[in-house]
């Protein structure tokens, strides 16, 4: 369906989960994919929270290929809450989730190919929360805001958009009962739901889209839920 023949694509956090699926779909579409992850992979292993690691990674990509056509900032930050999370935990999450996407965009900007695209993976938690998720939520809110700032700053060099996934089961499990039926689309998401949208946003079909956020959550964040409505109940601990 998609053709990214001879395109150079960078995917952070591409060794597993959504990132791995994104990398595989780009590769299947003809792209050369450069992954950076703290987990083992076939291109570059390193900590995205470390400035020198980002610089060494960018240097290798440019030395190997000379340009970048698509930058997918997917790596997920550590989640910790206000009760148990330390200053260091929270700061680390922001370095992975916000600072690294900013710095990689800065490092690669002089080398973007014609029609370049950046897609930042945020989360539906950029607009709603559960208790004790402060570091993750702050990072995802940050990358969502960073998206429209970069879209303006990089106008003419690259389009910049973000995706906010909802419940995505990276094992492709099929859910039944309330887990599925609570979703307006009747199922839980899987990594392909996100990867397909990433490839679309990086394609010429999305050439008039920049600075936007696409929430892919099966409609969950559009439901207005109150205790007692339509069979919904609040169970308090």
Residue ranges and their predicted role:
Residues 56-60, 81, 88-96:
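Active-site Tyr-X3-Lys motif and surrounding loop/helix of classical short-chain dehydrogenase/reductase
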Residues 162, 177-209, 214-218, 237:
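C-terminal helical subdomain
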Residues 76, 86-102, 119, 143, ...:
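Catalytic Tyr-X3-Lys loop
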Residues 105, 139, 147:
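Active-site helix of classical SDR
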Residues 77-91, 110, 132-135, 172-174, ...:
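Conserved mid-core segment of classical short-chain dehydrogenase/reductases
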């Amino acid at each position: 369906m998609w053709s990214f023949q001879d395109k150079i694509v960078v995917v952070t956090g591409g060794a597993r989960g959504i990132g791995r699926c994104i990398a595989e779909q780009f590769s299947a579409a003809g792209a050369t994919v450069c992954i950076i992850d703290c987990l083992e992979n076939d291109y570059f292993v390193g900590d995205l929270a470390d400035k020198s690691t980002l610089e060494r990674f960018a240097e290798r990509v440019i030395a190997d290929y000379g340009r970048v056509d698509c930058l997918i900032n997917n790596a997920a930050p550590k989640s910790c809450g206000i009760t148990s999370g330390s200053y260091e935990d929270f700061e680390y999450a922001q370095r992975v989730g916000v600072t690294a996407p900013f710095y990689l965009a800065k490092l690669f900007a002089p080398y973007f190919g014609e029609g370049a695209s950046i897609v930042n993976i945020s989360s539906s938690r950029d607009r709603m929360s559960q208790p004790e998720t402060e570091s993750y939520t702050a990072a995802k809110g940050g990358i969502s805001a960073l998206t429209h700032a970069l879209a303006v700053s990089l106008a003419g060099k690259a389009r910049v958009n973000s995706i906010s996934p909802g419940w995505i089961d990276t094992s492709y499990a099929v859910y039944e009962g309330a887990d599925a039926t609570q979703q307006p689309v009747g199922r839980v998401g899987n990594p392909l739901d996100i990867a397909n949208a990433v490839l679309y946003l990086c394609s010429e079909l999305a050439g008039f889209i920049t600075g936007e956020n696409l929430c892919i959550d099966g409609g969950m964040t559009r439901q207005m839920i109150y205790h007692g409505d339509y069979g919904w109940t609040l169970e308090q601990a």
